[in-house]
Design a protein with these regions (language model features):
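Secretory targeting and sorting signals
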Residues: 1-25
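Beta-strand-enriched cores of mature, soluble protein domains
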Residues: 26-183
Length: 183
C-alpha cells in the first residue's frame, strides 16, 4: 500500500472538505476551518484524518459515515507564507477509510493511500498534484464529478476553488463510485 512517488498525501480530510493542520490532528469534520498552522518544519509530522458524516443527499442518496481504520499519513511542510500559514505541503502514507451506509450497515474499506503535493492559496483555494488513491467527496454542483464519494486513483491534478468546487483532471487513472458500492 505504501506509495513513494511524486509528492505525498493525507488527502481524505481535505478532499472531503477540511484543511488539515500540520503537526496537529486535522480537526476533521467536513467544513471545518481553512487556516493551517505550521509545524516545526523539521521533517514529517502525523496528519491524522478524523471521522466524517454526511446526511442523505449530501454525497450519496443515503447517510454516510467514514472512519479511518488504518491511518499512517504524514505531512512535510515545504513553504509557508509570510504570516506563517502553510503554503505547500507533501502528504504520504497508508490510509484506509471505512465508508458505511448508515441505513443498511453496508460498508467498503476504501484505500486512500496516495501521495500529493498540495498548494494552499491565500484565497482558500487549493492546487493538488497527486498519485495513487485518494478519497474525494463532491457536493451537488460542486465539481466536475457528479455528487458522490469517490476513490480517485492514478496520476492526476485537482483544483479546489475558494467556493469548494473540485475539478479533478485525470492524466491517467480511474474513479470508483463508493455510493454505488454501498448503496
Amino acid at each position: 500500500m505504501r506509495r513513494t512517488v511524486l509528492a505525498p498525501l493525507a488527502l481524505a480530510a481535505v478532499l472531503l472538505g477540511v484543511r488539515p493542520a500540520v503537526a496537529a490532528p486535522a480537526s476533521a469534520g467536513p467544513g471545518n476551518g481553512t487556516h493551517v498552522e505550521a509545524g516545526t518544519g523539521t521533517g514529517w509530522d502525523p496528519a491524522p484524518s478524523a471521522p466524517f458524516d454526511f446526511g442523505a443527499g449530501l454525497r450519496c442518496d443515503f447517510p454516510v459515515h467514514g472512519e479511518p481504520v488504518v491511518d499512517r499519513v504524514v505531512q512535510h511542510v515545504l513553504d509557508t507564507d509570510p504570516d506563517g500559514s502553510v503554503k505547500r505541503v507533501l502528504y504520504k502514507g497508508d490510509l484506509v477509510i471505512r465508508v458505511t451506509n448508515t441505513e443498511t450497515g453496508a460498508f467498503y474499506d476504501a484505500d486512500a493511500s496516495g501521495s500529493a503535493l498540495v498548494e494552499y492559496r491565500t484565497d482558500g483555494s487549493q492546487s493538488w498534484a497527486a498519485h495513487g488513491p485518494v478519497l474525494v467527496g463532491v457536493g451537488e454542483g460542486k465539481g466536475n464529478l457528479p455528487r458522490g464519494l469517490y476513490v480517485v486513483d492514478g496520476v492526476y491534478t485537482m483544483s479546489i476553488g475558494a467556493d469548494g468546487y473540485k475539478a479533478v483532471n485525470l492524466v491517467r487513472g480511474t474513479t470508483d463510485d463508493l455510493c454505488a458500492r454501498i448503496g
